[in-house]
Amino acid sequence: MAKICGIDEAGRGALAGPLSVAACVLNSEISGLNDSKKLTAKRREELFKKITKSSNFLIAYFSNAQIDELGLSECLRRALKLFKAHFESFEIIYDGNLDYGVGITTMIKADGKVAGVSAASILAKVSRDRLMNGWDKFYPAYGFAGHKGYGTKSHLDAIAKFGYSDFHRKSFVIKPKLAQSSLF
């Protein structure tokens, strides 16, 4: 059986910040791997260190401006195409149900089933979270370190009070009903 290159992303549904897409080929077994959303932040950091020391990986970032210009689907397609070219001798498994025309294997919930995809999930999440923690220092009023750019009540409240920052995705529209019930 061919060695597996797992791919997953973080930040897909966020209102601010980048989309982080990671590809990972594990060179040794790492215990405790799972979908990054099912792990604590502390455990993700521990596993991130192990993964980066014992695997081949790439992480692609797409800024909020690139997401606004290209759209999420095109950003994902470009990352998958890059990873397919870089890891061409591996079986590539992407967590999801769309291959974006790239010709790779997709698997729903692969981040909880395939070790390489779990590792990619952790790489994407931890690297993006670290970026959001850094951006929190430039935009403290928005609380990025807490919600990581996702549409929590506190984030929606900050947008209502301060407007969009340069780090927000302008193409992501907050639905009026949600804005009225959550923002005011």
Curated annotation (Swiss-Prot):
Its EC number is 3.1.26.4. Its main location: cytoplasm. Residues 2-184 form the RNase H type-2 domain. Signal peptide: none annotated. GO terms for biological process: DNA replication, removal of RNA primer; mismatch repair. It catalyses: Endonucleolytic cleavage to 5'-phosphomonoester. It is found in: Cytoplasm. Gene3D superfamilies: Ribonuclease H-like superfamily/Ribonuclease H. One of its GO terms (molecular function) is RNA binding. Its cofactor is Mn(2+); Mg(2+). A divalent metal cation binds at D8, E9, D95. GO terms for cellular component: cytoplasm; ribonuclease H2 complex. Keywords: Cytoplasm, Endonuclease, Hydrolase, Manganese, Metal-binding, Nuclease. Manganese or magnesium. Binds 1 divalent metal ion per monomer in the absence of substrate. May bind a second metal ion after substrate binding. Belongs to the RNase HII family. NCBIfam families: PRK00015.1-3. Endonuclease that specifically degrades the RNA of RNA-DNA hybrids. This is Ribonuclease HII. It comes from Campylobacter concisus (strain 13826). The gene is rnhB.
